[in-house]
């Protein structure tokens, strides 16, 4: 009897230990997202509606544009706008996006912050590439700096640099030093330089995603691979339109995507390249905008961006207490700010409101 009781007690102890472990694991996985995701959901409700965008398109002046945003979350960022130039408005909108990232770092669980830091590094890559290209083209580099990223002071110093060699000193000790040195030595051209920057960036994103577990890995890996596919598809199609060969295009592509682009690279025309994509998982996305793509590839860029957001939103519904919610919000916020920037530029250029509404809807 005592042996039976002992076995029973041991079994109960094992069961309770297992239940305790599973409960603790569930709490560890999901509870940290309860507060931030609830807060983000409240913020999502404040994203601008189509009606609001139409109202902004009717502004006619940038001063009215700013006034029409006073009842939104952009009010504080636009408070210092005084000369009402498009550059001033754009800088304010960039600060708003930076504020979104800062909030994510503040409210998200510690284990999630690393991915958003890597996303922010993507703005470093964009800034570095733009500054270097501007310098090589003898254009004012500061005009191409976005007020966002983890190394903004260095980027601004690069923009002010008098020589290309001075930029190398500024980049010393960063992950970008070696590839920039290759550019200076003439070992690679500026196109390959930019490709290498983005290869490093997406490589880091993918490595991070693959290092995660469970739903976090599913969500982040899906996002990164979709993002790589988007870049590669657009790069390949632009190159095909420019008449480049498969051998010229291959070094421009980023590893880690899901779409096999080799058949596309070896076809003879842009139309045939689009036809090759028809049998991929992006076939429907492309078919929906096929006619417009032939005139303007930015239409496909917008469609692919929207597809990524929709996919992350689907994952958010499946994993409501996860990193999908903040990721979805940041992507929507970035899209919103791109649209606001486009409207501001069109207003400054004197475009009629109805045309602004039409063009703003096409912004990626």
Swiss-Prot record:
Intracellular or extracellular location(s): Cell membrane
Principal location listed in the UniProt entry: membrane
Designated gene of the protein: atpC
Pfam family name, one: vATP-synt_AC39
GO molecular function: ATP binding; proton-transporting ATP synthase activity, rotational mechanism; proton-transporting ATPase activity, rotational mechanism
GO biological process: proton motive force-driven plasma membrane ATP synthesis
PANTHER family to which the protein is assigned, alphabetical: V-TYPE ATP SYNTHASE SUBUNIT C
Keywords: ATP synthesis, Cell membrane, Hydrogen ion transport, Ion transport, Membrane, Transport
Membrane topology: Peripheral membrane protein
Family matches, as Gene3D superfamilies: ATP synthase (C/AC39) subunit, domain 3, V-type ATP synthase subunit C domain
Name by which UniProt lists this protein: A-type ATP synthase subunit C
Entry's family note: Belongs to the V-ATPase V0D/AC39 subunit family.
Subunit relationships: Has multiple subunits with at least A(3), B(3), C, D, E, F, H, I and proteolipid K(x).
GO CC entries: plasma membrane; proton-transporting V-type ATPase, V0 domain
InterPro entries: ATPase_csu/dsu_sf (IPR036079), ATPase_V0-cplx_csu (IPR014272), ATPase_V0-cplx_csu/dsu (IPR002843), V-ATPase_V0D/AC39_subunit (IPR050873), V-type_ATPase_csu/dsu (IPR035067), V-type_ATPase_csu/dsu_dom_3 (IPR044911)
